[in-house]
Structures are given as structure tokens and as C-alpha cells.
A protein has these predicted regions:
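Conserved small/polar residues in nucleotide/adenosyl-binding loops
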Residues: 166-168
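A sequence-level detector of short, solvent-exposed, charge-rich linear segments
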Residues: 23, 58, 95, 111, ...
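Gly-rich Lys/Arg/Thr-decorated short loops/hinges at beta-loop-alpha junctions or inter-strand turns
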Residues: 12, 57, 75-77, 121-129, ...
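Flexible, glycine/threonine-enriched loop-and-boundary segments that flank and lead into catalytic domains
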Residues: 150-164
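Terminal amphipathic helices with adjacent charged low-complexity linkers/tails
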Residues: 88-138
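Conserved catalytic cores of soluble enzyme domains
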Residues: 1-108
Length: 168
């Protein structure tokens, strides 16, 4: 695994590294996705852990499921290792394509400029009533982001993790 880690480290900050986990990923192979830029997991079929439930049961006498130990939901909500959770393999690949379309190919290129249907002088009427008069009242900042970005295109990273934050 040393060669894989070496390549991850050399590529870090140079090219985008995206790991798409569409099944079990166990043992030393788990370390590589954990140090890539983005991890996409499929809910219900993806699992990442160093050692499986059987070994945990033998060593600690604790019974834990594959899902609780290293499923997509666990890594999306508790460990923060996964950045996106897909409902199936097809959606995982769609997310990967969408993510790649937003990133430069390497550190020497600028981020892609995508065409927009939004007018340069459009108004954002929903913003007028979004922030309440009472500063102690909450409001949905995602609405502000969606109203502000072109075509309402917003892909939130780690939307299930640290819910008091917006990850952009």
C-alpha cells in the first residue's frame, strides 16, 4: 500500500482525486480513499472499514453491522469521510461527472467556466424576504446561495455532516 499512498500524496493539490466506493472496501485499501479530495459512497452497498464485523465481534465481543461500522450513512454523518452519498451506482457516477465538470483538471488550470441562462441583471426577489427582522430567528442560508449562484446550481459537499455548517 505504500506505493498507493505515495501516489496519493504526490497527486494531492495537483490533480483532483475522487474515490467512488460502490461496494466493500476493507483493510489497507481504505486508507487511500480517506486521503483523496472527494469520496462518493453508495447507500446500502458501500462499506469502508479497516476490519470487518466478524473481527470486531471476536476481539471486543461487540456486534456491529457492516452499515454501522462503515456504511455510507456512517461516513456521511459521523466520520465525515464521505463527501457525497448516492442512492445507487448510477447516481454515484452521475455525481462524479457533475463534480468533474466543476473542477480544473490540474493545479495549473482555472476552474471551468460554464454557460448560464441567467441574465446578468436578474433580480433575486426571494432574498428580499429571506432574512427575518428578528436577528435571533434562523433562516435557510442555502436559499440565499441557490438564489445567488448561476442557474441555482449548487452542489453542497458533505451535506449530511456537521449540519450547522454549509460545506461549499
Amino acid at each position: 500500500y505504500a506505493e498507493i499512498f505515495f501516489r496519493n500524496v504526490r497527486a494531492s493539490g495537483v490533480i483532483p482525486q475522487i474515490s467512488v466506493i460502490m461496494g466493500p472496501c476493507a483493510g489497507g485499501a481504505v486508507y487511500s480513499p480517506a486521503i483523496t479530495d472527494f469520496v462518493i459512497m453508495v447507500d446500502g452497498t458501500s462499506h469502508m472499514f479497516i476490519t470487518g464485523p466478524e473481527v470486531i465481534k471476536t476481539v471486543t465481543n461487540e456486534e456491529v453491522s457492516f452499515e454501522d461500522l462503515g456504511g455510507a450513512s456512517t461516513h456521511a454523518t459521523k466520520s465525515g469521510v464521505t463527501h457525497f452519498t448516492a442512492v445507487d451506482d448510477e447516481e454515484a457516477l452521475e455525481l462524479t461527472r457533475e463534480l468533474i465538470s466543476m473542477l480544473p483538471s490540474n493545479n495549473l488550470q482555472k476552474a471551468p467556466v460554464l454557460p448560464t441562462r441567467d441574465s446578468i441583471d436578474r433580480t433575486c426577489d426571494r432574498l428580499q424576504s429571506l432574512v427575518p427582522d428578528n436577528p435571533k430567528e434562523p433562516y435557510d442560508i442555502i436559499v440565499a446561495i441557490e438564489e445567488t449562484v448561476d442557474d441555482g446550481a449548487f452542489l453542497e459537499v458533505q451535506s449530511e455532516y456537521a449540519l450547522s455548517l454549509i460545506h461549499i
